A protein has these predicted regions:
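N-terminal redox-cofactor-binding region of secreted/periplasmic oxidoreductases
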Residues: 1-430
Length: 430
């Protein structure tokens, strides 16, 4: 069979694409996922289903690619969580449902991609969500992804202290962090109603997986793109030790910021010198593949809590956050502060870790404490992804080059000073 579309990766984007494309009954779609499939909420394991603070969701071996990356040339390697499960990273993430600023999308428009202006993407933000707290021009009321905020009366003591400390230091009140004009401190929007991580699996595939024109294949590793000349026409896929070939009119890579460029390069699209050095036949010399690797670097200031102060490890770890513009920056809300409680609940978390992960988390029984995280939302620094082998099972080298520009360093230092000052506030005296 030749499909109309083959989508690689059933994650945050792939599951949505498959659902939307199969709205037309005469359009056939094959959705391929490397990890396991959980067809309903009852079959989800706890670390995927529970979205409050399982502690294991982003570091366990069962649903994570277990990538490691280099933050900077001098820093120790860090885990790079990427979902290997139906729903992709939306099935293991922290569920922060925070939009970019309008200027972010308008910048893409100004670069020539006029379908990505804020005014053009806003209808789709509204279409995808059911916001339980806000309505009006900027929010949806009947979309597949459920968004909510923790009510003030349900904030834990330390989250209230963070909010009050921010207000005392001059942050304005920002109750709707997804409003286009917002800045300041307020409740963080999450896609976890009743503590359930509402992934694209639950939100989108639940309403489409019954369709006869949608085929979902889990536990399948895509090894290579097949080309007819320079046009993609199929894929080589491995499942349970057997190799298969599938064909489609259009091949869509939706495997994430690591696996998509990796697959392109393994298939012969990328920097020619890098590919030939690994014995990969060059289909298209494209030095941009693997370049311009970007992320939101986060630093944290940590405090131990007073003896006798009890924090529930099953309570929400984040409820409140603040968006602000760094001093001297022309990028509005380029910084974010989040208050987090942290705790490892019990030894069961350690039991679910791979040996590799345990070696990088030797002190797995982290003392209960709190931290204020400083996130650089639009960094200047860029990194790169580089193949180390022609074997799809060997992860590429990930070099992020965090804080490699003076402007990023200035904003990061200022953010850490703000975090430390907030943590020393009288509101945390208890």
């Amino acid at each position: 069979m030749k499909y109309d579309y083959i989508i690689v990766g059933a994650g945050s984007a792939g599951a949505i694409l498959a659902t939307r494309l199969t709205e037309k009954p005469d359009t056939s779609v094959l959705l391929i996922e490397a990890g396991p499939d959980y067809p309903d909420i009852e079959s989800l394991p706890d670390e995927v289903r529970i979205g409050l603070s399982t502690g294991a969701d982003i570091i366990t071996k069962d649903h994570n690619w277990q990538f490691w990356g280099n933050p900077s040339p001098k820093a120790a390697p860090m885990p790079v969580p990427r979902g290997r499960v139906i729903g992709g990273s939306s099935s293991i993430n922290g569920q922060v449902f925070l939009r970019g600023m309008p200027e972010d999308y308008d910048m893409w428009n100004d670069m020539g991609n006029n379908e990505w202006s804020y005014q053009k993407v806003l209808p789709y933000f509204r279409k995808l969500e059911t916001d339980l707290d806000y309505s009006g021009d900027f929010h949806g009321s009947d979309g597949p992804i459920i968004a909510r905020r923790h009510k003030r009366e349900n904030w834990i003591e330390s989250q209230v202290a963070f909010y009050d400390a921010c207000k005392d230091s001059g942050f304005p009140d920002g109750p709707d962090q997804n409003h286009p004009d917002v800045t300041g401190v307020g409740p963080t929007p999450f896609n976890n109603p009743n503590g359930i991580r509402w992934s694209t699996n639950l939100g989108y595939l639940t309403m489409s997986r019954h369709r006869l024109n949608l085929t979902i294949k889990a536990n399948c590793i895509t090894q290579k793109i097949i080309f007819d000349g320079t046009s993609a026409c199929g894929l080589e896929v491995e499942s349970q030790g057997e190799k298969f070939t599938v064909y489609g009119n259009q091949i869509i890579l939706s495997a994430g910021a690591v696996a998509s460029p990796q697959l392109l390069m393994l298939s012969g699209i990328g920097p020619a010198d890098q590919l030939t050095s690994l014995g990969i036949n060059v289909v298209k010399d494209n030095p941009g593949v693997g370049a311009n690797l970007r992320d939101h670097p986060i630093m944290s200031a940590l405090w131990a809590v007073k003896e006798g102060h009890i924090q529930d490890p099953e309570a929400p770890r984040t409820q409140v956050s603040a968006r602000y513009t760094a001093a001297g920056s022309e990028i509005r809300n380029d910084m974010k502060l989040s208050f987090n409680s942290f705790a490892i609940a019990d030894s069961r978390v350690e039991d679910r870790l791979s040996e590799s992960t345990q070696s990088h988390h030797a002190d797995i029984n982290t003392p209960i404490g709190v931290k204020i995280s400083v996130s650089l939302q639009l960094a200047e620094s860029v990194g790169h992804l580089r193949l180390v082998s022609s074997d799809v099972n060997e992860q590429p080298e990930l070099n992020f080059n965090y804080y490699s520009t003076e402007f990023d360093l200035e904003r990061g230092r200022e953010g850490m000073r703000k975090a430390i000052n907030l943590g020393e506030s009288k509101h945390f005296s208890n």
